[in-house]
A protein has these predicted regions:
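N-terminal metal-binding scaffold of metallo-dependent hydrolase/deaminase domains
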Residues: 1-54
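Flexible loop residues that form catalytic
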Residues: 15-16, 78, 137
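Hydrophobic faces of well-ordered beta-strands that scaffold small-molecule active sites
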Residues: 71-75, 132-134, 157-161
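Gly/Ser/Thr-rich helix-start
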Residues: 47, 72, 129
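Alpha-helical scaffold segments that flank or form the walls of functional sites
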Residues: 86-155
Length: 161
């Protein structure tokens, strides 16, 4: 038997690219929508009442005043800089030399790379980002740590060594 969870609330979904056609044709907002999740994956997005009738055994969570939308995509990120978020520098070179380069060298330790990768991905998921494209460090295991952390969380990533 599959594990089913039904999220009820206003839904936002896309059937096309709103930059290539009228947004009314590409974007659908359903104020009485639902998202059926089966075994941790989105199975169906549609009318909440219809989904509830079709899946009476599903665990239901209501988001009355919330908008349920697709996961966000971050197309350019440097996960190794997670620990120095909001560090200040007068000029870019000062910031790089004072914070970035020393922090990225710390990821030469595989355990630390794993810790930072996990911390970064937990932050992204907590804020609705489900897909990322990240730079890693010059250390090959920094990419391995990110891929492993993403696999552990079921998150999609693009990164490289």
């Amino acid at each position: 038997m599959t594990n089913q969870r039904l999220l009820l609330g206003a839904t936002l979904s896309y059937s096309g690219n709103p930059m290539q056609s009228a947004w009314e044709d590409a974007v659908k907002i359903d104020t009485e929508g639902g998202v059926m999740i089966e075994d941790g994956r989105i199975a169906v997005v549609g009318n909440g009442d219809a989904l509830r009738a079709a899946h009476p055994q599903a665990e239901v969570t209501r988001y009355a005043d919330a908008l349920i939308c697709p996961g966000f995509v971050d197309a350019h990120v440097h996960y190794p800089q997670t620990a120095i978020i909001a560090s200040w520098g007068k000029r870019l070179i000062d910031w790089l030399n004072t914070y970035t380069f020393p922090e990225e060298m710390r990821l030469s330790d595989p355990a630390y790379a794993g810790e930072i990768a996990g911390r970064y991905l937990d932050l992204t998921l907590a804020h609705g980002t489900t897909t990322i494209a990240s730079y890693c460090t010059i250390h090959p295991h920094s990419a391995d740590a990110l891929f492993q952390a993403a696999e552990d969380r079921g998150q999609r990533i693009v990164a490289g060594k």
